[in-house]
Amino acid sequence: MPRTSRKRSETGFYHVILRGNGKQNLFETDKDRAAFMEAARSSFSRDSVTLIAWCLMDNHVHLIIDDPLDRISTAIQRVASTYAMYFNHTFGHSGHVFEGRYGSVPIIDDEQLLAAVKYVHNNPLKGMGITPDRYPWCSYSEYTSCLLYTSPSPRD
């Protein structure tokens, strides 16, 4: 049975989730997390995708992206394959790093966008009991102090 097509976002905004294969950790060190963010930044820049919010947990990743040109598949595939090559080389593994297809939820309006960003930023609290302001691997601090990986959307 063929799998269903992804739902396209009319707004261009998506909540993307990538999970480690077999619930394995995607990140062992901060160097691994930085490598993932570099892969995301490079791919998104190449595909005109803007990273709005993000959170890197040990075994999964949340990304809120603005993709007005509908390049989500190419962009996420490039991020995942670039990081998988890094991960497998670094840890002497082979095979899949991510579990199946990435998940994506189209965001339909500003209210849902705000809720998705809040959900992503609160993931460390929910998963590890760490408040977003104390967790360095989510974009919360970028919103409060203008740092690091995300950039303003060209639509701003």
Regions found by a protein language model. Name each.
Residues 149-156:
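Conserved small/polar residues in nucleotide/adenosyl-binding loops
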Residues 2-13, 17-58, 64-66:
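An N-terminal domain-cap segment
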Residues 42, 86, 153:
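Active-site catalytic microenvironments for nucleophilic, acid-base chemistry
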Residues 17, 96, 148:
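Short acidic (Asp/Glu) and glycine-rich catalytic loops that position anionic groups and cofactors
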Residues 67-69, 74-145:
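Basic nucleic-acid-binding interfaces
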Residues 40-43, 123, 147:
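Alpha-helix boundary/capping residues
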